[in-house]
Amino acid sequence: MSNHKILTIDNLSLQEFDSEAELIPLLTPEDEEEMNNEELPVSLPILPLRNTVLFPGVVIPISAGRDKSIKLINDANAGGKIIGVVSQINEEDEDPSKDDIHKIGTVARILRVLKMPDGNVTVILQGKKRFEIDEVVSEEPYMTASIKEVSEERPDENDSEFTAILDSVKELAIQIIKESPNIPSEATFAIKNIESQSFLINFVSSNMNLSVKEKQGLLSINGLKERALETLRYMNVELQKLELKNDIQSKVRFDLDQQQREYFLHQQMKTIQEELGGVSQEEEMDEMGQKAKTKKWDEKTQKHFEKELSKMRRMNPQSPDFGIQRNYLELFLELPWGEYSKDKFDLKHAQKVLDKDHFGLDEVKKRMIEHLAVLKLRNDMKSPIICLTGPPGVGKTSIGRSVAEALGREYVRISLGGLRDEAEIRGHRKTYIGAMPGRIIQSLKKAGTSNPVFILDEIDKLSSGNSGDPSSALLEVLDPEQNNAFYDNFLEMGYDLSKVMFIATSNNMAAIQPALRDRMEVIKMSGYTIEEKVEIAKRHLFPKQLEAHGLTSKDLTIGKKQLEKIVEGYTRESGVRNLETKIAQVIRNAAKAVAMEEEYNKKVTDEDIVKVLGVPRLERDKYENNDVAGVVTGLAWTSVGGDILFIESLISEGKGALTITGNLGNVMKESATIALEYIKANAKKLGLAIELFQKYNIHLHVPEGATPKDGPSAGIAMLTSLVSLLTQKKVKKSLAMTGEITLRGKVLPVGGIKEKILAAKRAGIKEIILCHENKSDIDEIKEEYLEGLTFHYVKEMSEVLAIALTDQNVKNAKTLK
């Protein structure tokens, strides 16, 4: 075979192929004669193709992924390299049988097999002769069939009509190549150099954009002249489609050019009209001037507006600056300069509104009522800047709306979480296209008054980036001495924010910039107690969810005991968001029963709760007996409330080592060390031999080792545990304690007293030891929460031991020598 230049048609490279080069041949008349003289085998393995048809003489690559196809190719490649190729009737069939394939196919030679990384096989095939399946011999491991050759009816060599048809085929093929943007012009060279009549028809048929059914129809035509005519018909249709497509594209391009020209002329005409008359813009600017006269501006603001309006009159209406200037003046007019909503000074009404929407939160409510009282006495008082800090879900954001309702003010809120661009606070300068005011000014425009209740939500989530530090921009907003002339970059004028009541919310005060934190009055909101959560659920959450699910109190009720079971057994949070979700689950179960007319309990029972929510997994600890030496009940406080904490200690023979376990932090470890050193220093007073500390090892442990624990409040509990262990004395029944210890024997106050007291009461504790200085914390707790509890206030460690330890030894007391 002679070598040919590399050509690419429809992603198919056309070259000569031999064993030493990766080439795919164009068929010559000599090749065709040699191929026609080859005898076909009696039977062949049959390879079904999904979406293509192989013509004699044509070379195509095939990707095989089916197991049968891969095995067939591998076996044939290892043998005679001759296979039968047929097209599937339905390309979706994964395992076609003899009834799912066309009977007419092409004998093919395997030129090359390439194994792909994904396990598939790519095989390059060259068509040889057409054949017809006589009978399928087997279908496993792949299809094998007996075949017979299908002869090709060739026209007479002197048939001038056939010659003209072939010339037309070549000419149309060249025209299609020129019209199609996807076929390279080099393909013309290949068409012109094809000498074989049948290969020309087969090559063109193979590369036309036809369906498998249409190509199979061409392959099935025995007469070469008839096949050439049918191919010519398809080519005419293809050429007409291409010409029509190109005409449409040319027309679209012309239409776009025409539209652009008309737009340009229209803009020119509009500019000329504006220069001659300028009617619409002038009217708009006159309206702005009239509206400005109704505003309560000071002289400086009035002059600034007139100056900016005059600047707008001189601008070209088509320039981008004109649109920015219009937006600026519209904002200037829409801002509520000097417009304030009238405050309601009915303090009883305000208290009622606050109590209606929020249970507890006494400190916040007290501060709001105090502000109202002072505002009532002195009308020009600057609004406070308050920061409510506490865990999620305790009502920090929602209380702002209640405050606005109580004061009779508008309510606006912006979320600062993730804000990293200073321009979001101060706005963009007017020199930028698309410039806008900051969120503060935009929110005031939306509120329509200059004294709304303004919630700055998640102020601790502010972050800085390449566009500046928004937390620094807030320094001016939240400074009562500066915010009477807040400067927005877009507004370019000082705006009075002194009457705005800013309420910021945060979860972590440590994340707030110190200078910003210093400008705010911080009110800490601790998590709700169990009792408060139950009351909130009863007053607010349960009725709210009943209404949300289309039920009323006649359809379903719930008792405090069941609400407490949900709170303690299924939630562990500071707020009430998860509690509301659990209540909604219980109500949905009842709503389903109502809708399906099923029987159900109209009063929620414990069994209903377990049925809907499952078995409780968050049961709290209860007080245990005092029969074991070294076991003392302490009190702990976390962000989700209080809990009791057991301190355990054990003694064993050794050399005086102290082991501390239970996932404790450094502060708790130090408390244990202080307690032991205090006992050593006061061994004689406690009736202990100093030799004990050289002969025995002590192990101190706090259960629930998976939970990290830290803080000084377990100090007196650790001390009591170690003394009980060393003396083998019983600890007083139903007693818990909390307090920090020092080497001098002093007991210091600790925090979270309210939560700890409530946790102790729930756990069945009757007596509690506290530092004397914590008495003020007890005085702030409602009396109903303290019923049944006895408090012992101490200053010294000796007082703790005198109260906590009894004269009785524990059962099976050890004798320590």
Swiss-Prot record:
| PROSITE patterns hit by this protein | LON_N, LON_PROTEOLYTIC, LON_SER
Q: Give the Enzyme Commission number.
A: 3.4.21.53
Give GO terms for biological process.
Answer: cellular response to heat; protein quality control for misfolded or incompletely synthesized proteins
Which residues are responsible for catalysis?
713, 756
Q: Which reaction does it catalyse?
A: Hydrolysis of proteins in presence of ATP
SUPFAM superfamilies membership? P-loop containing nucleoside triphosphate hydrolases, PUA domain-like, Ribosomal protein S5 domain 2-like
GO molecular function terms listed in the Swiss-Prot or TrEMBL record: ATP binding; ATP hydrolysis activity; ATP-dependent peptidase activity; sequence-specific DNA binding; serine-type endopeptidase activity
Sites binding ATP sit at 390-397
According to the record, what induces this protein's expression? By heat shock.
Task: Summarize the protein's role.
Answer: ATP-dependent serine protease that mediates the selective degradation of mutant and abnormal proteins as well as certain short-lived regulatory proteins. Required for cellular homeostasis and for survival from DNA damage and developmental changes induced by stress. Degrades polypeptides processively to yield small peptide fragments that are 5 to 10 amino acids long. Binds to DNA in a double-stranded, site-specific manner.
Protein's name according to its UniProt entry? Lon protease
Q: Which organism is it from?
A: Flavobacterium johnsoniae (strain ATCC 17061 / DSM 2064 / JCM 8514 / BCRC 14874 / CCUG 350202 / NBRC 14942 / NCIMB 11054 / UW101)
